[in-house]
Amino acid sequence: MNQLPERLKKLRERKRLKQYALSVRCGLHPDAVRRYETGESNPMPDALISIADELGVSTDYLLGRTSYPYMVDIPEK
């Protein structure tokens, strides 16, 4: 199941951003976030990275590959 639309909308609303504002902040077409949230289309990898960075979460979280929203840095030994 594609969790991107639901997670994207929830995170965007939590940040109190309009769809248009998030699209512009990420350098995307003004309708891009709306299309992603409705499932009309999926973001290209570079757009997904921009959105994740702007919302402060990992791309894996947006895609539903993990239930942890933040990346964890594990120091090398």
Regions found by a protein language model. Name each.
Residues L63-K77:
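Short, charged recognition helix plus adjacent turn
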Residues M1-R14:
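A short, Lys/Arg-rich alpha-helix, primarily the initiator
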Residues R16-R35, S50:
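Short alpha-helical DNA-recognition segment
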Residues E13, G27, T38-E40, I49, ...:
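Residue-level detection of the helix-turn-helix DNA-binding "recognition helix"
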